[in-house]
Amino acid sequence: MAKTEMYQPPLGNRALFKMSIPGSKSLTNRHLIIAAIASGETTIHNLLESRDTNLMIEGLRRIGCKIEKLNHTGTHDTGVISPHCTCLNDLIQPSDVRIIPSKHYTCSTKIDCGLAGTVMRFLPVLAGLCKGSVEFFGDDQAIRRPMDGTLHALRKLGVQVDGDRIPFTVHGRGEIEGGALETTEHSSSQFISGLLLSACRFKNGLTLKHIGNPLPSRPYIDMTVEVMREWGINVTHSDGVWAVTPKELTGKHITIEPDLSNAAPFMIGAIVTGGSATIQNWPSKTSQPGKYLEAILPQFGAEITKTANTITVSGTGNITGIRADLGHIGELVPNLVALATLAETPSVFYNIGHIRYHETDRIEALVNEISSLGGTITAGKDYIKITPTTLTRSGVWKTYKDHRMATSGAIIGLRHKLTIEDIECTSKTFPRFADLWSGAFGK
């Protein structure tokens, strides 16, 4: 599909398909950061090519890290195979890259963060290890994304920072002393991950203590810790305290898992249509928060079967609403709200206040769009309640430049006629999403 501003999802077709999902954005950008502070070359296989990962790669290049694209080898191509469409198999070719880090980074540059939280919260810490000034800027909506956790922490670590939100400038001195640090920030787990990922290059390592309100999306911090240990970094965690010791890292060969969060709309779409979707290369063990789909979707009435490397989700014809604490999996909330909108009984999702600070205020956006279709949805500071009703109005589903809002509109569009504005915002994490969606759910 050529770039398009408007997209009308296929309506009312029972889905029966198999597909492979592109590599995980969250894993890709974590491995890229660590590869940039290692000694020696690293190769990353099945790297996701999307706006967020391209911004990370370009940011690393701008501070002096050499990154080369290699000829892709392997079988983790992305595509859909369904009874009516086999032409989309191998639609998206993943990438293999070689990262050649610099021993000492010296630079004076500008880095575009777009709307990528991993870029704006991971790279500034690495910039603090550089000798020179790095200015960070981004999309218009980036200014509303909280940055206090990262920038206040850098200041406490002795790094000069001008500004409190996008745009801001980090003035690195070539090293960070490290040591003990306390933080009370709780609007995003990425603040913790960003500090941990580069901490083995701090002169004295890092002992990071979080106090105050619970952190959201804790599985993403667990993912960070697992990635660090994969690289041989000594990191421990106990009672809200993470400790990282200094270490010189060697290069590695890394293979990126499929992005399980990007599988969510396709799995949910199968439930909505009463069909069946098989996701290939599903890991048997993973740190990705998308793994919780295995437990959550059956609560809505889905049937799930697994093999050694696949998962199949089938709709039963009935969708039951649920009450659930989704604080640990905020990225999945918009798609689950879309599913709940099409259920037969009410749903309540709580402890999700942090998703107000994602690419857009996702709680407000979901209330606005579902209400505009005639749905019944209410919200508070940190919860959403959906009372299923017949959607009575067609119209344009606004995405707010948010990829999860776009995929949520696509789910509802399987049952109710609508047009999605700016479907290409999905390229943030899932290039050519609309082509794959039409292939999976079209006639």
Curated annotation (Swiss-Prot):
Keyword annotations: Amino-acid biosynthesis, Aromatic amino acid biosynthesis, Cytoplasm, Transferase
Any one cellular-component term (Gene Ontology): cytoplasm
Subcellular location per the Swiss-Prot or TrEMBL entry: Cytoplasm
Segment forming the signal sequence: none
Gene Ontology molecular-function annotations: 3-phosphoshikimate 1-carboxyvinyltransferase activity
Residues annotated for 3-phosphoshikimate binding in this entry: 25-26, 30, 188-190, 217, 331, 358
Reaction(s) catalysed by this chain's protein: 3-phosphoshikimate + phosphoenolpyruvate = 5-O-(1-carboxyvinyl)-3-phosphoshikimate + phosphate
EC identifiers of the protein: 2.5.1.19
Primary localization: cytoplasm
Active site location: 331 (proton acceptor)
Binding site for phosphoenolpyruvate: 25, 117, 145, 190, 362, 404, 428
A Gene Ontology BP annotation from the UniProt entry: aromatic amino acid family biosynthetic process
Pfam families reported for this sequence: EPSP_synthase (PF00275)
Pathway(s) served: Metabolic intermediate biosynthesis; chorismate biosynthesis; chorismate from D-erythrose 4-phosphate and phosphoenolpyruvate: step 6/7
Lineage top rank: taxon: Bacteria
PANTHER family associated with the record: AROM/DEHYDROQUINATE SYNTHASE, PENTAFUNCTIONAL AROM POLYPEPTIDE
Function, as annotated: Catalyzes the transfer of the enolpyruvyl moiety of phosphoenolpyruvate (PEP) to the 5-hydroxyl of shikimate-3-phosphate (S3P) to produce enolpyruvyl shikimate-3-phosphate and inorganic phosphate.
Subunit structure: Monomer.
Family as reported in the entry's similarity comment: Belongs to the EPSP synthase family.
Annotated protein name in UniProt: 3-phosphoshikimate 1-carboxyvinyltransferase
Organism in which the protein naturally occurs: Tropheryma whipplei (strain TW08/27)
Gene from which the chain derives: aroA
